[in-house]
Amino acid sequence: MLSFKKIEQSDINELKKYYDYDECMGCDTNLLNAYLWRNEYNIKFAFYDDTIVKVYCNPDESVWGYCMPTGKNIKGALEEVFKDAEERNGNLQIVMLTNGNRAMLETMFPGKFDYVRSPENQDYIYTSRDLATLAGKRFHAKRNHISKFYRTYTDTRFETLSDSNITDALTVAKLWCAENDTDPEASSEITAIREMCDLKDEYNVKGAVLYVDSKPVAMTLGSEISPKVYDINFEKALREYDGVYAVINNEFAKTLTQYEYINREEDMGLEGLKKSKLSYNPVIILDRWNAIPKKR
């Protein structure tokens, strides 16, 4: 069987060597992301012939989803994945496939899999220019929303993340959790946000805090997927301030124009979140698929 281990901070830079970041756009290829959510989603990886295999495990440590291997011997690693699944429990599912991954898998193993779309996991990707400028008729409503915010709240301040305002960013995140106490992700998000702030200097983490009347009311954190794609890992705001999400989104995008694209991640199957992400006119919706062996 493959020997899986949980991702540690010391693994992040080593694992990056196996990804072709000229092609990567998905948030699942952001290894800082994998590290931050390692406990919540029990994310592990194994090496095989200069190739890595990432998996998601159940609480009992059984594997529920294999990711597409990446490295020099993808086909060989997939054959090893098939053996591994059979030796463990016979539960083979390859998850989070992009259209490109799906095509590669089908070419390597024609007719072996059925493919099930996973829309709740698709990434919404925008040009940084669109989010920073909100130019044109498509963004008319967004510009109006932001203008209304600034007319309503006259004492506002936007600060990029620094040692002096990390506490304020965490304060917003905690207040957001208190407003959303039915969200099972809440406590794990606070842990991940705190860890991400601690690692900001080492992994090119950027962020921002928005203030109204000197009170922190919104925060955001992001990290680099590739030299052309930036990932928005977290964005939290206090809902009593109408327009606050539009403002923090727009102001932070203005600091990211050196990147061609901004990935605002998935909608998790939440209709309200889906509507919000679509309202910003993504230029790419990165499809996701799960591959399940055909029944013989």
Regions found by a protein language model. Give the residues of each.
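Acyltransferase donor/substrate-recognition loop-hinge adjacent to the catalytic core
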Residues: G111-T182
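Conserved active-site alpha-helix within GNAT-family acetyltransferase domains
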Residues: R102-V116, N144, G269-I285
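Aromatic (often tryptophan-rich) hydrophobic motifs at membrane interfaces
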Residues: G207-K294
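Conserved donor-binding loop and adjoining core beta-sheet/short helix segment
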Residues: T29-N101, Y211-R239
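A mid-sequence, solvent-exposed acidic-amphipathic segment
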Residues: D163, T167-V229
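Short secondary-structure junctions
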Residues: F4-K5, G26-D28, F45, G111-R117, ...
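Short catalytic-loop micro-motif centered on adjacent basic/acidic residues
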Residues: Q93-V95, E159, Y261-R264
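Amide-forming acyltransferase catalytic core, primarily the GNAT-like/NAT-type
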Residues: M1-D49, E185-S188, D201
